[in-house]
Regions:
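IMPase-like, lithium-sensitive Mg2+-dependent phosphomonoesterase catalytic core
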Residues: 1-178
Length: 178
């Protein structure tokens, strides 16, 4: 488990020699909960190379192609689960009447074109110059160098931003602000 702002990994396990690891960031955008907005979590499942040895940080730091599954969960007006096992992305919606997730979006793909982007405008004074230039070009709309109008979306959650991009396309930016 890794906590926002803390780059170290904190392993929590009842079985230190477990075959699989669950890595997650719980309640990304939790500030949204007090405003009755959606919050979410991102997760990944990894398989350990050596089960007979104690779990180490290296077990967690594997390249993306080695992950067994990954996804995100959204908690809001409906509860959604978006999941990949490396062969496409599927979306599931919780059916509260029966307590199961139902496949509602098979083969989700990112649209090839979008007119939206997400970035925290309150951090603009800290953005690197290329980021400032790109955002300025987008905000200038159809009269600007990009020749079309853009919509800026921001809700302080990378998980919600990732879901929005999967459904509507666009870009989520979180530039280093020092």
């Amino acid at each position: 488990v890794s906590v926002a702002g803390d780059p170290s990994i904190h392993a929590v396990s009842r079985s230190p020699r477990a075959r699989y690891l669950l890595v997650f960031e719980a309640l990304h955008g939790s500030i949204n909960l007090c405003e009755n907005q959606t919050a979410g979590l991102a997760f990944s499942i990894l398989e350990r190379a050596e089960v007979d040895a104690p779990c180490t940080e290296a077990d967690f730091l594997q390249p993306g192609f080695r992950h067994v599954a990954a996804g995100l969960g959204l908690y809001g007006p409906s509860t959604l689960l978006v999941l990949t096992t490396g062969r496409g992305v599927d979306g599931f919606t919780l059916d509260r009447d029966v307590g199961n997730f139902v496949l509602t979006d098979r083969g989700m793909t990112i649209p090839s074109r979008s007119d939206s982007f997400a970035i925290n405008p309150s951090e603009a004074m800290h953005w690197p110059a290329p980021t400032k230039r790109y955002v300025d070009e987008c905000l200038r709309g159809a009269e600007g160098p990009r020749g079309r109008d853009f919509k800026m979306r921001w809700n302080a959650s990378a998980v919600i931003g990732a879901f929005r991009i999967l459904v509507h396309g666009g870009m989520f930016m979180a530039p280093d602000t020092g």
